[in-house]
Amino acid sequence: YRVPRTVHKVAQRIANRITVRRPKHYNPKPEDGTVHHIFEPDIEKFKKGDWMIMAQCNYMLNEVCESLKQHGFYFENRGYRSISLKLAIALDTWKSLVKGEEVTANAVKDLYYFMKSITRIKRGFKNLPNTQADDMFTLASLQENMGLLATKDMTWDVAMDKISEDNKTYIAALLRRGEDLNRAPRIKVSTIHGTKGGEATNVVLYLSLIH
């Protein structure tokens, strides 16, 4: 009883095309639900709600992921976030430091990961030697004791000079959209097989790829 009646009908029609499979009998939910046949997805529809985008094979999803990136959407592709949690933490860490707030040594390590030695960090300080995970630092204390060369007037994209230009452009688009990079993405992209057991309020299935 996981899907509405109209969705169940379409799912059964697709499943019946599979010649070698073990039949599974299940009933739909009591409500009707809706199914829309779309020839070209309206990318702006992904602004709200949770989404699951499916295709038959991994390589078929590459174009989908590229389109989502170009339009500044945060998504998960086959279990991997389009922006890693480490990078999301690094962005928040720099923002906190510029505000004058304290951050943990672990957070600083994530930040330093995206900074180049010599240009943003003095040699020998990349891994914060002689520190504990919960030690606290400010921008000033990092500059004085932990080799930080980046300065308060630098924006995140200047301070974290190890991030590629493509990723900087993408992150800027995400931030303009107000995406929360610390939360699990609303949009998930996967193969049909890979989404087994997954659920979403809105589902996009590339039927043209299934014969």
Regions of interest found by a model, annotated:
Residues Y1-I210:
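The feature marks helicase ATPase cores and/or their adjacent C-terminal helical subdomains
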